């Protein structure tokens, strides 16, 4: 438990209105308490960490000067919103973030009136805030709308689409965009914009000009000298900072300013709050600010398990191999013998397992920043020239490049391999990061081959199979570890479209896809049923399915994907096309967005863990429950 007496000011804040009761001179102390509280609370429970530390002062300044929730703050992505949650009535629940029944890891409209827009994916804030500002303008409403977006999120095209629209509107809506520039997304930010922002913040000449003005005029500037200094600085800024870019798009640019300097933030926001039209404030922050270890390892402290803040993160010893680890090793091994292989990631080098590859093959590694659409069409272009690109991407982010997958890759039957990480149930990050839809939206694409491994060894073989296949392929694997089947060092391939019979039984055939093979086998062996590791979602093993249909009374398909349009639907479609009438029971994820909880809890909730599969079978066929295999034996 956290001792609230250690936070005398913070404990008085239940809403931003309480924050606004403090004097400006007290806000520095409030910020220190908030930062320390964040360190202590996340240390106890785990969660997103470094990003929130970097926006403590900015969060306080915004809630202090703006009349939230009437004025609306739209946070991009949401990694940085723990301070926002603490100041908006959720301080005592912050330790429940990511836990079942607890606070959501990102802003969520159903959770608080201060969460104006649900987020989780990047670069949506400006579009959403613009929509709010337009409606406010139409209604004659004077409320303020602010979008807070990081420099990493500003690498996505959607952000510029929104800027372009907002800056070109007439009459222009009142919108403030705050560019939180910390040189990071989750991994290090990359690309031309990042370099340009770096030139702006690192310009010795501009800083010298600014400091010279301070020395000459001090704090005793008249209105005339203040206007002169502003024009003088704006003139020189055009030579060093991205003001030209944003102002050409119709935004008035202010900055860059120190995002940890509360007086500077308050001064800038007081002015901007009175201005009309599109405004952009550029603030410089440090991810992990105030916790030295996080400042020194911003990637490692992006999201953390519970830890002792006095000691920092403890490096784990030998750990069980994850599916991401399997992909990482396979990629380097295949690259060693296949010079055509090129690897692409949309800003997820660490998460997708590309660190080693980026070090060993830097000329064959392409981090395109948060630009999934570009990543996929880039891969398509590479494939037209004989390369074999591998796009390493989370399932949830593949949704953002779906048109490019269909139009630019599949339509042209180009040789692109998609390594789809975090497929199916993901867990604590909640609905915004779930991969519950991917089998459905990939299976329906013509020319696409789609596989899901039952274990680590099979994952490696599927990646090799996909690499050597002519045409678009997706290998979809889950977050975390598997059953513990150690992969071979070889680069063996599987026969395309051939399933694996795991156990021969009678009456009922359990058809497991991906991670659901394990519970299917556990239950099927105990009940004497046939168990199949389907391996391929597309193409299905037609020969085996027709044979099983002749010898079994019913099929049960089991998948960690929504039932609608999923792998089980493919089985039903195949039998229907063959004129075979056979009962099929589909077990899978519900037609709903699953909330945050552990993977184990979500699989159990959906009824596709071993106990759930067992219960589903017995509810339909009670005669299976003989003395030799009671329900308690299956877990």
From Swiss-Prot:
One of its GO terms (molecular function) is thiamine pyrophosphate binding. Pathway: Metabolic intermediate biosynthesis; 1-deoxy-D-xylulose 5-phosphate biosynthesis; 1-deoxy-D-xylulose 5-phosphate from D-glyceraldehyde 3-phosphate and pyruvate: step 1/1. One of its GO terms (cellular component) is cytosol. Binds 1 Mg(2+) ion per subunit. Binds 1 thiamine pyrophosphate per subunit. It comes from the Bacteria. Thiamine diphosphate binds at residues 79, 120-122, 152-153, 182, 291, 372. Its EC number is 2.2.1.7. Keywords: Isoprene biosynthesis, Magnesium, Metal-binding, Thiamine biosynthesis, Thiamine pyrophosphate, Transferase. HAMAP family: DXP_synth (MF_00315). Homodimer. Belongs to the transketolase family. DXPS subfamily. This is 1-deoxy-D-xylulose-5-phosphate synthase. It comes from Xylella fastidiosa (strain M12).
């Amino acid at each position: 438990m956290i001792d609230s007496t250690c936070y005398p000011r913070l404990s008085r804040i239940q809403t931003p209105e309480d924050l606004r009761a403090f004097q400006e001179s007290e806000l520095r102390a409030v910020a220190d308490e908030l930062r320390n509280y964040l360190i202590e609370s996340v240390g106890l429970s785990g969660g997103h960490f470094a990003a929130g530390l970097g926006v403590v002062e900015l969060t306080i300044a915004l809630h202090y000067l703006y009349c939230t929730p009437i004025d609306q703050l739209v946070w991009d992505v949401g990694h940085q919103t723990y301070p926002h949650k603490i100041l908006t009535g959720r301080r005592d629940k912050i330790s429940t973030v990511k836990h079942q029944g607890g606070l959501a890891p990102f802003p969520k409209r159903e959770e608080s009136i201060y969460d104006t827009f649900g987020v989780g994916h990047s670069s949506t804030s400006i579009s959403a805030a613009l929509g709010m500002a337009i409606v406010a303008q139409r209604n004659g409403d004077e409320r303020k709308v602010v979008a807070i977006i990081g420099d990493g999120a500003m690498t996505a095209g959607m952000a510029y689409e929104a800027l372009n629209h907002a800056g070109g509107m007439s009459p222009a809506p009142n919108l403030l965009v705050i560019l939180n520039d910390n040189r990071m997304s989750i991994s290090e930010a990359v690309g031309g914009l990042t370099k340009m922002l770096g030139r702006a913040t690192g310009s010795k000449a501009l800083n010298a000009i600014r400091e010279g003005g301070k020395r000459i005029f001090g704090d005793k500037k008249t209105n005339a000298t203040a206007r002169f200094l502003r024009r003088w600085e704006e003139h020189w800024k055009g030579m060093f900072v991205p003001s030209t870019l944003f102002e050409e798009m119709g935004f008035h640019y202010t900055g860059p300013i120190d995002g940890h300097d509360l007086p500077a933030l308050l001064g800038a926001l007081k002015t901007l709050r009175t201005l009309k039209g599109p405004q952009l404030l550029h603030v410089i922050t440090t991810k992990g600010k105030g916790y030295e270890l996080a400042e020194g390892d911003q990637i490692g402290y992006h999201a953390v398990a519970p830890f002792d803040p006095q000691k920092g993160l403890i490096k784990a010893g030998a750990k069980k191999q994850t599916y991401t680890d399997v992909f990482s090793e396979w990629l380097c091994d295949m690259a060693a013998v296949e010079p055509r292989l090129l690897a692409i990631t949309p800003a997820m080098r660490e998460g997708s397992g590309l660190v080693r590859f980026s070090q060993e093959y830097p000329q064959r590694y392409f981090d395109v920043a948060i630009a999934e659409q570009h990543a996929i069409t880039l891969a398509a272009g590479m494939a037209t020239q004989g390369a074999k690109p591998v796009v390493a991407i989370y399932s949830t982010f593949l949704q953002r490049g779906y048109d490019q997958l269909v139009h630019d890759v599949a339509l042209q039957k180009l040789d692109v391999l998609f390594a789809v990480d975090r497929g199916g149930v993901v867990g604590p990050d909640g609905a915004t990061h779930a991969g519950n839809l991917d089998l459905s939206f990939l299976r329906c694409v013509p020319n696409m081959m789609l596989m899901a491994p039952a274990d680590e060894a099979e994952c490696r073989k599927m990646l090799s199979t996909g690499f050597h296949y002519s045409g678009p392929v997706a290998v979809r694997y889950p977050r975390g570890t598997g059953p513990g089947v150690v992969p071979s060092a070889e680069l063996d391939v599987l026969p395309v479209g051939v399933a694996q019979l795991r156990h021969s039984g009678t009456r009922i055939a359990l058809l497991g896809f991906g991670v659901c093979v394990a519970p299917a086998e556990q239950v099927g062996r105990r009940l004497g049923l046939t168990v199949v590791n389907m391996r391929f979602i597309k193409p299905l093993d037609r020969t085996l399915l027709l044979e099983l249909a002749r010898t079994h009374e019913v099929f049960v398909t089991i998948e960690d994907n929504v039932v609608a349009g999923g792998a089980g639907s493919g089985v039903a479609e195949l039998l229907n096309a063959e004129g075979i009438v056979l009962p099929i029971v589909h077990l899978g994820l519900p037609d709903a967005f699953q909330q945050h909880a552990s993977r184990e809890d979500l699989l159990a909730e959906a009824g596709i863990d071993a106990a759930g599969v067992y219960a589903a079978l017995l509810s339909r066929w009670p005669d299976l429950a003989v003395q030799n295999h009671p329900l308690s034996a299956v877990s």
